[in-house]
Structures are given as structure tokens and as C-alpha cells.
């Protein structure tokens, strides 16, 4: 594997998140309903947009991503963001899964008043993202300011017929979490 510095890997990961989750049209690519993009087309369009992207750099980002944000298709010709989409081009069909008793959501303290009113909503994303452990939720919350960890009564939600899914990188997904299912 070629050597790249941390900044180059982080910048490339952010770029891939932007085009594979939110704005594929920004560089002129189209994602299929499951979020897949042709790798050759992605590289070509990224280069035309002034981004230094090669297959070797892509391979390194996919292989070293601590959160496993991206995956390759079984034939190695396509790539997608595992979850976190806001683009209407994508509607990944995750298999429904029974959650553990509790899941966790990391957020910043400045969002608490709104969450106490409306619960957790997906906002611009397709799903609310939840973590299986508090440590991961804390890291997520810290990205947005002083972190607060909310406990989600996931099994109670599931018993009431509210569905959960789990992305291939372990992130739990649900449509919304009402205030009654949150512990502060």
C-alpha cells in the first residue's frame, strides 16, 4: 500500500463522504439506489474537479478508515459510503435487526433543548445514527462540541414495532427516537 500522510487521508475521506453521502452531482457522478458509484468514473470526475484521487489512495482510505465509512462491491468495481446519506439518489435496503437493550447517541450539549422537545430526528440524513457503546457515542458527540451521551431504550422501541437496522460498519440506524425512549 502506498504511503500517504494523515492530512491527505483525512481530506480524501471528507471528500468521499461529501460526494458519496451528500452531493454526488458536485463532481458529476450518479449513485445507484444502494449508493454504489463506479470507481473509474469517480476517480475521473474527481480529477476533473481538481482533486488528486487515485485507486491507490482510494484503497488506502477504505482500508485504514477507523469507522469503516466506505466499502467496495464484491467485484471491486464500485464504492459506496456505508451509511450517513442525505442525497435522494440513495435508499440502501438494510435488513431489519433486533437491537440490544440500549443504544447510545452522542451529541453536543447545545442541542439538548431541541432534543428534549422533539427527540432525535434524522434531519437531512435518512436515519438517526446510534452507537452500540458509550465510548463511540462520546467520540461522535465531541465532534460537535462538549459531548453529551443519550441512552436510547432500543429494545423497548423495537417491542413497540419501531424498526432498527445495522449498517455493515456496526452503526445502528432508526428513523426517529421519541423523547420517551431517551435517558439523559
UniProtKB/Swiss-Prot annotation:
Q: Which stretches are transmembrane?
A: none
Q: Does the keyword NAD apply?
A: yes
Family assignment from sequence similarity: Belongs to the KptA/TPT1 family.
Q: Name one GO molecular function term.
A: NAD+ poly-ADP-ribosyltransferase activity
Which keywords fit this entry according to its UniProt record? NAD, Transferase
The protein's job, in short, is: Removes the 2'-phosphate from RNA via an intermediate in which the phosphate is ADP-ribosylated by NAD followed by a presumed transesterification to release the RNA and generate ADP-ribose 1''-2''-cyclic phosphate (APPR>P). May function as an ADP-ribosylase.
The protein here is known as: RNA 2'-phosphotransferase
Does the keyword field hold NAD? Answer: yes
The source's domain of life comes to Bacteria
Q: Which GO terms describe its biological process?
A: tRNA processing; tRNA splicing, via endonucleolytic cleavage and ligation
Please report the organism this UniProt entry assigns to the protein.
Escherichia coli (strain K12)
Q: What is its EC number?
A: 2.7.1.-
Alphabetized PANTHER family for the sequence: PUTATIVE PHOSPHOTRANSFERASE, TRNA 2'-PHOSPHOTRANSFERASE 1
Which EC class, in a word?
transferase
Amino acid at each position: 500500500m502506498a504511503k500517504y500522510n494523515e492530512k491527505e487521508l483525512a481530506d480524501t475521506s471528507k471528500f468521499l463522504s461529501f460526494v458519496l453521502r451528500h452531493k454526488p452531482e458536485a463532481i458529476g457522478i450518479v449513485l445507484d439506489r444502494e449508493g454504489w458509484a463506479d470507481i473509474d468514473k469517480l476517480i475521473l470526475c474527481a480529477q476533473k474537479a481538481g482533486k488528486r484521487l487515485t485507486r491507490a489512495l482510494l484503497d488506502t482510505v477504505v482500508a485504514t478508515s477507523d469507522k469503516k465509512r466506505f466499502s467496495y462491491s464484491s467485484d471491486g468495481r464500485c464504492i459506496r459510503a456505508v451509511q450517513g446519506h442525505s442525497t435522494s439518489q440513495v435508499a440502501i435496503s438494510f435488513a431489519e435487526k433486533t437491537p440490544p437493550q440500549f443504544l447510545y447517541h452522542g451529541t453536543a450539549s447545545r442541542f439538548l433543548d431541541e432534543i428534549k422537545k422533539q427527540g432525535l430526528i434524522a434531519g437531512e440524513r435518512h436515519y438517526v445514527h446510534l452507537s452500540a457503546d458509550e465510548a463511540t457515542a462520546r467520540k461522535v458527540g465531541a465532534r460537535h462540541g462538549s459531548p453529551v451521551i443519550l441512552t436510547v431504550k432500543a429494545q423497548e422501541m423495537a417491542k413497540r414495532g419501531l424498526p432498527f437496522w445495522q449498517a455493515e460498519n456496526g452503526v445502528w440506524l432508526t428513523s426517529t427516537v421519541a423523547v420517551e425512549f431517551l435517558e439523559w
